[in-house]
Amino acid sequence: MNIHEYQGKAILKTFGVAIQEGIVADSPEQAVEAAKELQKTTGTGWWVVKSQIHAGGRGKGKIAGTEQRGVALAKSLDDVKTISKNILGNQLVTLQTGEKGKKVNKVLIAQDVYYPGESETKEYYVSVLLDRSKGRNTIMYSTEGGMDIETVAHDTPHLIFKEEIDPKVGLRDFQCRKIAFNLGLSGDGLKQMTKFIASLYKAYDSIDASMFEINPVLKTSDNKIIAVDSKVTFDGNGLFRHPDFAALRDTSEEDPTEVEAGEFGLNYVKLDGNVGCMVNGAGLAMATMDIIKLSGGDPANFLDVGGTANAARVEQAFRIILKDPKVKAILVNIFGGIVRCDRVAQGIVDAYKNMGTINVPIIIRLQGTNAVEAKKIIDESGLKVYSAIALQEAADLVKKVLS
């Protein structure tokens, strides 16, 4: 689960991390009031208007059809109002959103922490994430923080460093000092960065996050270390321990069909292909998607019905797949280990009866627990479907119906 920048900063602040202060607004008028309030509390004379969407690259991104950046400096209250008006309610297109962009429903009005006229500020990149290949939390950091970090990672990966954390002992003090030293800091700057790294890791570890990215981390001319941005991803498996954080979810930032699927316990990810697939188990789902691709099709989705699939869940899975107008065929590939094939078969029959006419050809492969009973249910239903025993046979049928 992802959250917005302003929400991530609020979490950081509770763990003692210095942040760029800001107030969220969802209208130009609220934005102006937020700017006035920030001027009172922080003394800032300039402000930064920051689009709040679940995507990076906002600083370089533009509002569709305009030259308005997703993050812009406002030097007056009139600027705050104008920029907010240009951004709110419109589609922001960045490298991470694709051509359609994402609608901006909120802006963060933040204090300007770069101090006009100062030349001794420095931006860094710091993130904490789970390196699944190593089975360890890892701190990634670089002296090349800012809007061009993606370019740095691609062109000069040697400028990004990693510090692995031993899960037995956690982050050690010497590791924090090592990171600060490698970032070229000394004196008060080194002390402040050491403290910053320790607090950031504590926040990450305490909330069961899978990633906490700060880009940029700013060192001011008076050696303050400030989180200017934040990007947080939670481990969904740990959210039951943090109901307050689960409430931060913004479903307007997610695909509506994926949200609906989640409500029925379905693991669904929409793709751009023409063959819908319904599978139980993530590994089998990925293999099925490969088979579809090798057969000349393109998977329209990833859909895992899980190990407790029943007729109602299978019917809902069909409804979700068929909402995609690009789907020209559906491949059902179920291995009955925990899930019973007869339940899946009954779900397919019920879906046909309850949904009326289905004009998309369906290829069904059911193997494992109660597969014989499942075949009987399908055969006696009179449904016009293609049945397969081997996976290659299913792939050949996909190729046939697409041609």
Regions found by a protein language model. Give the residues of each.
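ATP-dependent carboxylate/acyl-activation modules
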Residues: 1-214, 218-332, 342-346, 353, ...
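Glycine-rich, proline-tolerant flexible connector loops at the mouths of alpha/beta enzymes
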Residues: 335-339
